[in-house]
Amino acid sequence: MIQVRDVVKSFDGNVVLNHISADFEDGKVNMIIGQSGSGKTVLMKSMIGLHQIDEGQILFDTRNGQQNLAGMKEKEVRMLHREVGMLFQGSALFDSMTVQENVMYPLEMFSDMTNEEMVARARFCLERVNMPERSFNLMPSEISGGMQKRVAIARAIALNPKYLFCDEPNSGLDPKTSLVIDQLIQDITREYNICTIVNSHDMNSIMEIGDNIVFLRNGIKEWQGSRFEIFHADNEALNDFVFASELFKKVKSANG
């Protein structure tokens, strides 16, 4: 679990996160949503230590007890990152490495495994995301964008993380492939009881897998709830966000 408590972040005097408090739960897909400029990317980057917050606390339940990210030294942040998997907006695979070598990379950097153990773990993770064995020795350029995203997920879970951060994981994918990636993220979250945090503005994805949703507007948390509550939320800003989405337009069109 991650507890964000009264977090403030400013850039050049401009408040981007204004006293944000929210809980992000284990075994659930926690989504940070909002329009561009709402602060969702800054919040996610603050939660993984890429931005130093001005005020507040970001509390992680780690294998060594609860730790406050705010004020951690660089070495301590690196130690925390061993429990964190990251899925970037682009797949961010290394072009010079094979599919299997890409998944082995974090193991080489952060684990004490033998080469044989790393190979076995990488292959297990690739199989878990339904990558065919014939693809393991291919280069990223030789597989599709959807497969590249699967490899990125396999790499993100290689170290058996407690936390998985996903930045717009469906960016650039067609609807069918996006659904597959959503289901993979949801299944892995449930199976390994991971605290998954997804930064998204895609209503299809939000309504497919959003267990715990935090809606930001202009750096303020306007609403928090589940995907089953989102269409009934008594919040004008959230309603505007939902009604402007392509998903709502399709539903409205289908219903005449």
Language-model-detected regions and their locations in the chain:
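Conserved ABC ATPase "signature" region
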Residues: E116-R134
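ABC ATPase NBD Q-loop/coupling interface
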Residues: Q57-M79
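Conserved catalytic motifs of ABC-family nucleotide-binding domains
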Residues: N160
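H-loop/switch region of ABC-family ATPase nucleotide-binding domains
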Residues: S200-H201
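Helix-to-loop junction immediately C-terminal to a conserved catalytic motif
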Residues: I48
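Catalytic Walker B motif of ABC-type/P-loop ATPase nucleotide-binding domains
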Residues: L164-D167
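Conserved ABC ATPase signature
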Residues: M139-I143, M147
